[in-house]
Amino acid sequence: MIKKGEGVWLNGVEISRTRKGYIGQQIVIDYLLRKNARVYEPIVDDFRIDLLIEHNKKYISVQVKYHTTMSNGSSIQVKVAPTNAEWIAIPVCVKNKTYIMWYENTSKNKKYTVAFQMSKPKNNQVKKVNFYKLFLKSPIDN
């Protein structure tokens, strides 16, 4: 995981936010295709819906938020832009392994921030803490 303030670099060039977004989106698409889901991408991103998943004759809308920075040593904060997407998919790297957190968007069309704890907090607090491991089940996992 990259610390706050450090960019993502490739061959000596910092990767743009747009490029990081495409990388995150491809991580999610790869995961969904391996699960045998049908995945569709809108031509434009006017409504902040990155993917449409067809699964069991249902459509599920997804916004992808690729996260490469830690807000402190053990958690990340994800800023969600106003979207009508049902789910927020958040690819993250924990101990050199990539996971996708799936967060149900219960605040549609509102801007908000949600925090996820990536490791045990120093104060051992567990109440009202979003541990990333609790968000690894995708909406197509039965």
Can you name each region flagged by the protein language model?
Residues 1-47, 52-142:
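Mixed-charge (Asp/Glu-Lys/Arg
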